[in-house]
From Swiss-Prot:
It comes from Mus musculus (Mouse). PROSITE patterns: IG_LIKE. Its main location: membrane. This is Neurotrimin. It is a lipid-anchor; GPI-anchor.
Length: 344
């Protein structure tokens, strides 16, 4: 619907028709727009939604009557306003220019506008097309999603605007490079944990700054232990075993020794669990505490375990000496073989 199309009173509609038939377009005289110099309207006028549009028509002293029309609706005839829309105002009505302004332009104002003049000889018209640009707006976007590793996902981002905006998807991650999709839809087949994080949808059409919204993608996967650190501690000292695991959701930790679970509250022992790390602390190590401990990390998708040693200072020396002895034997083996060959 054009400017004022919904505001006419019945009597004004009748006057509009009469004006057009009687003095703007006399009987038997066709409306023309072929004169290269008179009347002359502007080229196409482009404005953003909410701004004001000025429509100018160049005339001269041959004009006896003049009017601005939106399609078949008269907005102004001379100094008289035939449109009740308060946004439409007369800017100038002189011997050289006839101009109106449409304030707070909206998309329904877009379309053709006609400057129609009457001279002593015949009527003439000139047209200008009003183009209304609209800033981009994201009207629909996927919600945050949680999905198991290996499954497929589809993200949607629908945007409106004039001209039609360009939609792009980008993975917000230090490892991500450039855009992952230049479309409203982002499809990821067999998603991996490295593809988790935030995905940014951007809509742009050069009318205003791009609009941006984000979707958080959580990729669930079973635990894996990235570090299992044993320690050597003398009797009577404090010792700590550490178990670090990566998992989504975060892993739950348990400690075992000889198939027996160690629980919080045991005298002299403390279990400290964090989202990705568990510590087993002995405040006063005894000979009985030495040995092999098992760290178990689990979540709803699976579990894993690792063996961690708590040993005394002497055990470190024995391990190193044992390694050296094995290396020495390997080094001597070729000499023994050569000696036997020469002997026989």
């Amino acid at each position: 619907m054009g400017v004022c199309g919904y505001l006419f009173l019945p009597w004004k509609c009748l006057v509009v028709v009469s004006l057009r038939l009687l003095f703007l377009v006399p009987t038997g005289v066709p409306v023309r727009s072929g004169d290269a110099t008179f009347p002359k309207a502007m080229d196409n006028v482009t404005v953003r939604q909410g701004e004001s549009a000025t429509l100018r028509c160049t005339i001269d002293n041959r004009v006896t009557r003049v009017a601005w029309l939106n399609r078949s609706t008269i907005l102004y005839a001379g100094n008289d306003k035939w449109c009740l829309d308060p946004r439409v105002v007369l800017l100038s009505n002189t011997q050289t220019q006839y101009s109106i302004e449409i304030q707070n332009v909206d998309v329904y104002d877009e379309g053709p506008y006609t400057c129609s003049v009457q001279t002593d000889n015949h009527p003439k018209t000139s047209r200008v097309h009003l183009i209304v640009q609209v800033s981009p707006k994201i009207v629909e976007i996927s919600s945050d999603i949680s999905i198991n590793e290996g499954n497929n996902i589809s993200l949607t981002c629908i945007a409106t605007g004039r001209p039609e905006p360009t939609v792009t998807w980008r993975h917000i991650s230090p490892k991500a490079v450039g855009f992952v999709s230049e479309d409203e839809y982002l499809e990821i087949q067999g998603i991996t944990r490295e593809q988790s994080g935030e995905y940014e949808c951007s809509a742009s059409n050069d009318v205003a700054a791009p609009v941006v919204r984000r979707v958080k993608v959580t990729v669930n996967y079973p635990p894996y232990i990235s570090e299992a650190k044993g320690t050597g501690v003398p009797v009577g000292q404090k010792g700590t075993l550490q178990c670090e695991a990566s998992a989504v959701p975060s892993a739950e930790f348990q400690w075992f020794k000889d198939d027996k679970r160690l629980v919080e509250g045991k005298k002299g022992v403390k279990v400290e669990n964090r989202p990705f790390l568990s510590k087993l602390t002995f405040f006063n190590v005894s000979e009985h505490d030495y040995g092999n401990y098992t760290c178990v990390a689990s979540n709803k998708l699976g579990h894993t375990n690792a063996s961690i040693m708590l040993f005394g200072p002497g055990a470190v020396s024995e391990v190193n000496n044992g390694t050296s002895r094995r290396a020495g034997c390997i080094w001597l083996l070729p000499l023994l073989v050569l000696h036997l060959l020469l002997k026989f």
